[in-house]
């Protein structure tokens, strides 16, 4: 912990289950992972075990997610966006389709709800179509609901 008080919150980012999550249990205020919902639940369960082992209240630690977010109206629109990204980045299309928050609006919003139910309190969204797409407009709808 930093010497100054109040100290800034300490984020421990990484999902290493033996070392990193143990450090998070001991010292962290927030943990941050890039995993699907099942992985988020798994990391949370392991973190909870580490918290019990070090005598820390698991609920004191904020669990957060960082990932790419790409939203489209329908599958055809999504395919077009992924094709454009793949061409621009030279990253295979499969990479994008495997990300948990890349899909249609309904798919992505449902997955975000699943993360919330799993205890995620904060999302750091990397928005690859920020300049030419409309994902950010879809995300703004989340704040209105």
Predicted segments — roles?
Residues 1-145:
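Active-site-adjacent structural elements that line small-molecule/cofactor binding pockets in enzymes
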């Amino acid at each position: 912990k930093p010497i100054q008080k109040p100290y800034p919150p300490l984020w421990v980012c990484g999902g290493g289950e033996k070392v990193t999550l143990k450090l998070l249990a001991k010292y962290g205020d927030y943990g941050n992972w890039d995993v699907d919902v099942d992985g988020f639940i798994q990391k949370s369960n392991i973190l909870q075990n580490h918290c019990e082992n070090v005598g820390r209240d698991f609920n004191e630690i904020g669990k957060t997610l960082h990932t790419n977010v790409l939203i489209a109206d329908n599958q055809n629109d999504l395919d077009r966006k992924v094709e454009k990204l793949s061409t621009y980045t030279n990253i295979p299309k499969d990479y994008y389709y495997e990300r948990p928050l890349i899909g249609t609006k309904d798919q992505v919003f449902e997955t975000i709800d699943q993360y919330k139910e799993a205890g995620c309190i904060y999302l750091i969204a990397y928005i690859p179509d920020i300049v030419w797409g409309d994902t950010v407009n879809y995300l703004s709808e989340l704040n209105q609901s």
